[in-house]
Curated annotation (Swiss-Prot):
It is found in: Cytoplasm. Residues 23-264 form the tr-type G domain. This is Elongation factor 2. GO terms for cellular component: cytosol; ribonucleoprotein complex. NCBIfam families: aEF-2, small_GTP. The gene is fusA.
Amino acid sequence: MSSAVRIVEKQLDEILAIAKNPAQIRNAGTLAHVDHGKTTTSDSLLMGAGLLSPKVAGKALAMDYVPIEQLRQMTVKAANISLYFEYGGKPYLINFVDTPGHVDFTGHVTRSLRVMDGGLVVVDAVEGVMTQTETVVRQALEEYVRPVLFINKIDRLIKELRLSPQEIQQRILTIVKDFNALIDMFAPPEFKDKWKIDPGKGQMALGSALHKWGITIPMAQKAGIKFSNIVDAYEKGYVDQLAQEFPLYKTILSMIIEHIPPPNVAQKYRIPRLWRGELNSEVGKALLEADPNGPTVIAVSKVNKDPHAGLIATGRVFSGTIREGDEVYIIGRRLKKKVLQTYIYMGPSRIIVPYMPAGNIVALMGVDEARAGDTLVDPKFSEIPPFEKMRYISEPVVTVAIEPKNPAELARLVEALKDLVVEDPTLDLKIDQETGQILLSGVGTLHLEIATWLLKERTKTEFTVSPPLIRFRETVRERSQVWEGKSPNKHNRLYFYVEPLDETTIELIASREITEDQEPRERAKILREKAGWDTDEARGIWAIDDRYFNVIVDKTSGIQYLREIRDYIVQGFRWSMEAGPLAQEPMRGVKVVLVDAVVHEDPAHRGPAQIMPATKNAIFAAVLSARPTLLEPLMRLDIKVAPDYIGAVTSVLNKHRGKILDMTQQEYMAFLRAELPVLESFNISDELRAAAAGKIFWSMQFARWAPFPESMLGDFVKQLRKKKGLKEEIPKPTDFVEVY
């Protein structure tokens, strides 16, 4: 990469000159289903900016800079790069993010979207719009990111499917129609029509990233090119000529400049969606305008560990200008930090720059405590609200136990794991204080494979990884009676019942429409109007567990000293939600209600060691008397298969408790949408391939939590408890509280 860096340095002054003018900046990134050709497309763009030699582009996978990505030919992390490109006689700076397409890595996509204003959605011409395409487009539209379309692998339509020029045209129209249907479904109302793809306006390109050519309909019309000419180019062997006349990088970068808005335009509609502050304030106005002279506000989108420089935070400057030596305040962490260095990215290389103004993507050294999703501001404005929290679509549902072969290396391993979780918040780390057991949870088996590979690379230590275990959730199916929890010293008594939390409230928590730090009256109004809550109950919410979707409500009145122990009760609530009484799995969808309390007057007798166990024990007794059950994670499968094999594929799914939700058929392909428990998904790949003689594509992603089948529940909970070294028998309420 050293030659690449030299080329960049030559342009650094020019890049900084453009960076000051938001109209000449574009923030975009690739979004796609796995293997549809995003990274190969990105490499072609690097070639255009002189960062890769033409011979190498398309094979180099330069943006796949973690070695495992090159081995597996798949992007795992989101990589950033700033490109210099001249268009219509004007220089532009295009900040480009390459994101992973594999479903296990949607967390990286979510974080990248925060810094983009537009997304180049890459779709394989043969496979068309797939589940992951739908997921990333939906996420992009939720973040008000405008999509444009690149239909890749046109060569496959010609060489593999041997389609005629008319059939190719039909295939492209079908993909555009499917893509526009997603925009119709998920786009904000004011952009449903504006953001639909119109091929005639050049909002779609088609081509082959591998063969480095790409063309839009207006370009084709201008040059007098028809689909038959493209078919000829492949059949008569002059594809290189296509790549010379219509280089992919020029087509894509021109499309980005024309159809993706500059930051000062995009922020006018994105800021009201991403930031809940006062838009008429000094900060609000600067954010809407992407004003480089306004107060500094930066949204952090990812954090990476650098072996030499420590933690590097990457984010977008939404207003102001960040300079080396500036102090920033990390909202939410209540910390002031000094920026030691500012950089821009060129793939894996970071180039030091003296400053970066609003509208650009920047990397910062010195803000070690910042995390993905954090907001950094000028300390004079430390009171402003932060950017909205990021929503991760998938949840960690698969767990492995990690054990060092040499116990002396435990601390080193734990440190490295903590760094991994900082870099990738969709990983979940639990360390059992008593046994020292390390449990790492991820979104899928591949996610964990890559995390453990990175761990080995970084620590150079030997450790064992257990076979993957599935994470479950515990919940209740009815309202319990009231149970009394006594503190160990018998001086405090707390009375609780639990009941199921309704789906609407869970959705309001998931979409962050209601949050713990919201003004209580505003929150109560939303709960009353949208979820039918009673006013007093809605106002009595003490805490919202937005990780597992549970709430605790205070329904008492006039109890002495209750305010003094409120925090301890909330801590006891959170403690009990992390591992329920059935099988020590997290609780989900539970409303915990405090109805009465007797609190000792002396603070020495009502500390956390008294109140937390009393809370937890009463909640556990209540859960066990409210028809508790397990929820298991289901995956959604989207399958494309030759019609002759539908029967065989269906019987494989049935055997694994799968359920077909939808089926459509075209002449050479059938499309099935199904749900399948994660528990049943481990060896299904081989079975599906065998059933369809290899003629099958499919993709999986997390769908939802569903109740475990009643007929299998008792035995399964016992097995689960045994695996965890617990007593096999399911506990009774009286194991936690005294009954008179």
